[in-house]
A protein has these predicted regions:
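Chalcogenol-based redox active-site neighborhoods
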Residues: 1-145
Length: 145
């Protein structure tokens, strides 16, 4: 897991719409990067919905949301569509982003761990959260910004 003050590793990956997303796209903005193990399951769905329900409050603070998992584009597209997510979901099927951020143990078939990073406008880790209550996390994180 990355530490507060670390430079966030740059990445390039496709989102659930097949668009290329890079960390550098978010330079100058604060970014919440939340990793979740599997699309359309349990607590991760509640957490994703929590971010969506507060998206305007995050935007009011000039904060962008980006979800990430090792799921396929198809699985994440269905997840985003079913839940009405307006923010992108990275499809890190090769686990490159997950490994760089300490959210995967290996490049084998392991899902991402639930980890959230807040990355500041200069690309440094501002906050790092590993153990959270999925239902409350989006609200408590928003309050901390």
């Amino acid at each position: 897991m990355l530490e507060i003050g670390d430079i966030a590793p740059d990445f390039t990956a496709k989102d659930h719409n097949g668009r290329i997303v890079k960390l550098s796209d978010y330079r100058g903005k604060t970014l919440v990067l939340w990793f979740y193990p599997r699309a359309s399951t349990g607590g991760w769905t509640a957490e994703g919905i929590g971010f969506q329900e507060r998206i305007q409050d995050y935007k009011a603070k000039d904060v962008e949301i980006l979800g990430a998992s090792t799921d396929s584009i198809e699985a994440n597209a269905k997840f985003a569509s079913d839940q009405g997510f307006s923010y992108p979901l990275l499809c890190d099927t090769e686990r490159e982003v997950c490994l760089a951020y300490g959210a995967c143990k290996s490049s084998s078939d392991s899902p991402a761990k639930r980890i959230t990073y807040v990355i500041d406008p200069d690309g440094k880790i501002l906050q790092a959260h590993e153990t959270v209550d999925a239902r409350k996390h989006p609200e408590t994180l928003l309050d901390s910004l």
